[in-house]
Amino acid sequence: MNSPANSSAARPAAGPKSVAAFQRASALMPGGVNSPARAFGAVGGTPLFIERAEGPYLYDIDGNRYIDYIGSWGPMILGHAHPEVINAITQAAAKGTSYGAPTEAESRLAEQIIEAVPSIEKVRLVNSGTEATMSALRVARGATGRKKVIKFAGNYHGHVDSLLVAAGSAAATLGAPDSPGVTPGAAEDTLVLSYNDVSGLQNAFAQHGDDIAALILEPVVGNMGCVLPTMEFLNAARDLTTKHGSILIFDEVMTGFRVAYGGAQERFGVTPDMTTLGKIVGGGMPLGAYGGRADIMNQVLPAGKVFQAGTLSGNPVAVAAGSATLRLLKENPPYEQLERLADRLADGLDRAATSAGMAHTVAKAGAMLTLFFNPEPVDCWAVADRCDREAFGRYFWGLIDEGIYMPCSQFEALFFSQQHTEAMIDETIAAAEKVLKSL
């Protein structure tokens, strides 16, 4: 759904103001951005610079409006600038933006998280999902006295040195799964396995079980596209970690409060020992959390000896946004609505791609979805890596010209908000059909 300024078929993919803004930013910041995927490296061209967002829409500085399927890469499940969240932020900021001291609001948010997430008995607030996963690994190693960690190719757990190995997200998109600056020593205790490979998991525990501190995974992968686990795989992860005394960590930074109020662990009925959270839990503000069994979390200083701290941890403005968001999700759960929208879009994209003769598959979980330019069902990174990246890039820019803003990478799931409607879904399907037929 385009604004009048967006209706001209002759306009370039990125408007002149975005082009100028990117040139300026590139002289000031590495690559012109503060997070790699935003540079549009996977699709080419100039990134769009955003002026504002409201409900399900983004507005760029050239005056174009887009139906937004990024949602700030996941947090905006209520839609952009929800009035009650903005009010909570405004009221909190008016009292002071940071105290460096405890507040009752932190306890209220902690209670909301503990009530919602099955695995969490105690929780620690931090500033990002990356910080949450980094801290959870340290706690797991401290609690077990072991060193080795299992992760899965294509799973992204933030820019943590020991986990930036065969990572998804921008690392996969840009062809740099192993970053310069990450020393061999930082990753030597990380075992990388194939997602959904039960036999590989069994073999790893047979060989290293007594040395494995933790197994960390995305219970629905969102950083090599939307990839679902098999129940056999999740149950094997749970059973093997229990048998060998290792800690099972679900990275629910993306899935937490999105695929169900209690996250993927509620959706699938598999309870980990620890959980990491981000995105929705902060209501669009910089906030993350990690938590789990009380005996594990009591290892964290000052209750225990594992050090973790942060100047802005429990920031009152971020806590207010997160608490308001979780309250609204509990009072008026959007999950059935989001499932219906996902079904509608998945079916429509499947029909459009089939009609266009495009080799594809569609995968979804709750309010997460990916159209893969690959005829094989994607269940691991080896299959995801065979997607047609060039076709995806043309598809992305075609949709931009139709006023639809999808993630700028084949390997990022798209997200819905409570503000999306069936009419918007139908408009998106019609745009996709037009673009796919032109590829």
From Swiss-Prot:
What is the enzyme's main class?
isomerase
User: Which cofactors does this protein require?
Assistant: pyridoxal 5'-phosphate
One Pfam family this sequence matches: Aminotran_3
InterPro entries reported in the protein's UniProt record:
4pyrrol_synth_GluAld_NH2Trfase, Aminotrans_3, Aminotrans_3_PPA_site, PyrdxlP-dep_Trfase, PyrdxlP-dep_Trfase_major, PyrdxlP-dep_Trfase_small
What pathway is this protein a component of?
Porphyrin-containing compound metabolism; protoporphyrin-IX biosynthesis; 5-aminolevulinate from L-glutamyl-tRNA(Glu): step 2/2
Which residues are reported to carry the modification N6-(pyridoxal phosphate)lysine? Answer: 279
| Molecular function terms, GO-annotated | glutamate-1-semialdehyde 2,1-aminomutase activity; pyridoxal phosphate binding; transaminase activity
Enzyme Commission (EC) number: 5.4.3.8
Taxonomy, superkingdom: Bacteria
CDD domains to which the protein is assigned, alphabetical: OAT_like (cd00610)
Q: Name one GO biological process term.
A: protoporphyrinogen IX biosynthetic process
Which terms in the GO cellular component ontology are assigned?
A: cytoplasm
Subcellular localization is given as: Cytoplasm
Q: Which controlled-vocabulary keywords does the entry list?
A: Cytoplasm, Isomerase, Porphyrin biosynthesis, Pyridoxal phosphate
Q: Which reaction does it catalyse?
A: (S)-4-amino-5-oxopentanoate = 5-aminolevulinate
Q: Show the SUPFAM superfamilies listed in the entry.
A: PLP-dependent transferases (SSF53383)
Please state which protein family the record places this protein in.
Belongs to the class-III pyridoxal-phosphate-dependent aminotransferase family. HemL subfamily.
The family database entries (HAMAP family) matched by this protein are listed as: HemL_aminotrans_3 (MF_00375)
> Entry's PANTHER family?
GLUTAMATE-1-SEMIALDEHYDE 2,1-AMINOMUTASE, GLUTAMATE-1-SEMIALDEHYDE 2,1-AMINOMUTASE 1, CHLOROPLASTIC-RELATED
* Assembly mode: Homodimer.
Q: What is this protein called?
A: Glutamate-1-semialdehyde 2,1-aminomutase
Query: What gene does the UniProt entry assign to this protein?
Result: hemL
